[in-house]
């Protein structure tokens, strides 16, 4: 695909942006009493209210045209059929197969029925989880397992950790699940202080069983185990792996039956639905893990079959393109008004930025427009006392997604009503703002003098007309959490398709790994560093001096 800027719909949107320059969202609501009803749609347990956007019917029609002209319909068919849409690695992209309906028996990719492999892995996971929870799996001293430490990084860490945290109300008694990712020794040291080697199982997640951070932490965990009473022959009772490199995992000390597969057609940031999600299944049980998969599948089917005009991922994805490419928005904020979802922005940050942080088109040419935005955010209402000031009065346009359940798992007094009120008030305030006249009258009503009114009122002006979406669900459940994450996966795919980039490789990450290994070797040796830049040389010298 060539640059999307050459598409007819893109050029029409460029003209339309000028038409919309002086249009306020308030005026759009005033002109259409049914706007809220028209700009609300539902799928997989979620309701999307996108009425508070700088968009009218013409905007949305042009955005739909853009998606179609960019080939989104064929791209969706390609992904769901197993086509090699990851062109730089010549791979299928089949995270959707990990949560396919049980009614679907086959999905052939390169001569292999991948659904058979997925179902076999789920049964393997189920047996593992059952043994842990019923006490059949025992440690080397015969005691029941009480703790599981998951060791991974990136998609092998963020997704499972975020989902396990989001499903806190569904956690099973008896086993606590902990997560380790950072190669900073403080991370694993802190977790090991919480557990007993006799009753702890480690799950090591690494496709190659060679990821630097993960393998370093796995070795540290094994060393700790061996120095606290365990023997090498006991390692198989306390270590399992999710990896495609069975030999390396066996050499580490694991039993082959406790090594779970990974596949090339699943990228790390899309892998929580696979055996990478084993820590989630241990935390909440396989019944809830299946519900998680089912919720994601419901969103998959919505995305695959629903007309673009009513399609949640398409609507959210194209609106994002509208702001990034036609309003110069450089970031996008996710603000969940649910304590258990507080870490979700970090997962979506990886999902989106690793997928769409690209500057090369599928055909090898350089892009001619902005691609992936910076994704950030945090829990409401905490953010209101931190960064919301910039959202309301800052100079940069930041589209916002508010995510909130209608009911809480912990109904205490008026807490949830207050939480919900804050969420709605923030979206409303972003839209309506405060005029100079309103600020002046507010000050007069408070008894301010004319001089004070003149001096202070300009500082209280809030321009408004800042866009936001609101996502509602009845309650955060395994199914709705699954659907929510799948929604953002598909939203990311929509945008990548429109921009004409590959959302499923990550060559920038790979470069960092290579250079990291090179620098490490220089830190621990007396190699000649004269070919390096002066800054890197000085930093290496500082490290060596500190270690002397």
Swiss-Prot record:
A single GO CC term for this protein reads:
cytosol
Database matches in Pfam families: PGI (PF00342)
Highest rank taxon of the organism: Bacteria
Q: Which family does it belong to?
A: Belongs to the GPI family.
Q: Which CDD domains match?
A: SIS_PGI_1 (cd05015), SIS_PGI_2 (cd05016)
Stated EC number for the protein is 5.3.1.9
Q: Which UniProt keywords apply?
A: Cytoplasm, Gluconeogenesis, Glycolysis, Isomerase
Function recorded in the entry: Catalyzes the reversible isomerization of glucose-6-phosphate to fructose-6-phosphate.
The Swiss-Prot or TrEMBL record annotates one GO molecular function as: monosaccharide binding
Using the chain's own numbering, where are the disulfide bonds? none
Q: What is this protein called?
A: Glucose-6-phosphate isomerase
- Organism of origin is Marinomonas sp. (strain MWYL1)
The record's section on SUPFAM superfamilies has:
SIS domain
**Which gene specifies this protein's sequence?**
pgi
The reaction(s) annotated as catalysed by this protein in its Swiss-Prot or TrEMBL entry are: alpha-D-glucose 6-phosphate = beta-D-fructose 6-phosphate
Q: In which pathway does it act?
A: Carbohydrate biosynthesis; gluconeogenesis; Carbohydrate degradation; glycolysis; D-glyceraldehyde 3-phosphate and glycerone phosphate from D-glucose: step 2/4
Active site at which residues?
A: 354 (proton donor), 385, 513
Biological processes per GO annotation: gluconeogenesis; glucose 6-phosphate metabolic process; glycolytic process
Where mainly found? cytoplasm
Compartments where located: Cytoplasm
Which InterPro entries has this protein been placed in? Answer: G6P_Isomerase, G6P_Isomerase_C, Phosphoglucose_isomerase_CS, SIS_dom_sf, SIS_PGI_1, SIS_PGI_2
């Amino acid at each position: 695909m060539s640059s999307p800027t050459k598409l007819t719909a893109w050029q029409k949107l460029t003209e339309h942006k000028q038409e919309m320059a002086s249009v306020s969202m308030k005026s759009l609501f005033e002109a259409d009493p049914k706007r809220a009803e028209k700009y609300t749609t539902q799928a997989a347990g979620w309701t999307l209210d996108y009425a508070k956007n700088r968009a009218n019917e013409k905007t949305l029609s042009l955005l739909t045209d853009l998606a179609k002209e960019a080939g989104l319909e064929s791209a969706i068919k390609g992904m769901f059929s197993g086509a090699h849409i990851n062109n730089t690695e010549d791979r299928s992209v089949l995270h959707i197969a990990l949560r396919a309906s049980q009614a679907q028996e086959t999905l052939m990719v390169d001569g292999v029925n991948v659904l058979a492999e997925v179902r076999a892995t789920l049964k393997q996971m189920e047996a593992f989880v059952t043994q842990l929870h019923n006490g059949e799996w025992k440690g080397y001293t015969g005691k029941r397992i009480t703790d599981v430490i998951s060791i991974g990084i990136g998609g092998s860490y963020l997704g499972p950790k975020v989902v396990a945290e989001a499903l806190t109300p569904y956690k099973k008694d008896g086993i606590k699940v902990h997560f380790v990712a950072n190669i900073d020794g403080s991370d694993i040291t802190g977790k090991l202080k919480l557990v007993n080697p006799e009753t702890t199982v480690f799950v090591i997640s690494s496709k190659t069983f060679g990821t630097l951070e993960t393998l370093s932490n796995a070795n540290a965990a094994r060393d700790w185990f061996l120095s606290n009473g365990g023997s090498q022959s006991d390692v198989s009772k306390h270590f399992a792996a999710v990896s495609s490199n069975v030999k390396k995992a066996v050499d580490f000390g694991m039993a082959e039956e406790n090594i779970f597969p990974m596949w090339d057609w699943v990228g790390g940031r899309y892998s929580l639905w696979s055996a990478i999600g084993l820590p989630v299944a241990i935390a909440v049980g396989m019944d809830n893990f299946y519900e998680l998969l089912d919720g994601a599948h419901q969103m998959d089917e919505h995305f695959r079959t629903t007309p673009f005009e009513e399609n949640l991922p398409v609507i959210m994805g194209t609106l994002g393109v509208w702001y990034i490419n036609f309003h110069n928005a450089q970031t996008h904020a996710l603000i969940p008004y649910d304590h258990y979802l507080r870490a979700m922005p970090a997962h979506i940050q990886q999902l989106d930025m690793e997928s769409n942080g690209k500057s090369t088109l599928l055909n090898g040419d350089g892009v001619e427009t902005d691609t992936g935005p910076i994704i950030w955010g945090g829990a409401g209402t905490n953010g209101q006392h931190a960064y919301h000031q910039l959202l309301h009065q800052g100079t940069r346009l930041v589209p916002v997604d508010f995510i909130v359940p209608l009911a809480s798992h912990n109904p205490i007094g008026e807490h949830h009503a207050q939480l919900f009120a804050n969420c709605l008030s923030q979206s409303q305030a972003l839209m309506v703002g405060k005029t100079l006249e309103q600020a002046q009258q507010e000050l007069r009503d408070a008894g301010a003098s004319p001089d004070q009114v003149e001096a202070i009122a300009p500082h209280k002006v809030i321009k408004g007309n800042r866009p936001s979406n609101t996502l509602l669900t009845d309650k955060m459940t395994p199914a709705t959490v699954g659907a929510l994450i799948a929604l953002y996966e598909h939203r990311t795919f929509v945008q990548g398709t429109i921009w004409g980039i590959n959302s499923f490789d990550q060559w920038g990450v790979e470069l960092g790994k290579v250079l990291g290994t090179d620098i490490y070797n220089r830190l621990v040796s007396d190699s000649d560093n004269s070919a390096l830049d002066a800054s890197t040389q000085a930093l290496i010298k500082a490290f060596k001096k500190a270690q002397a």
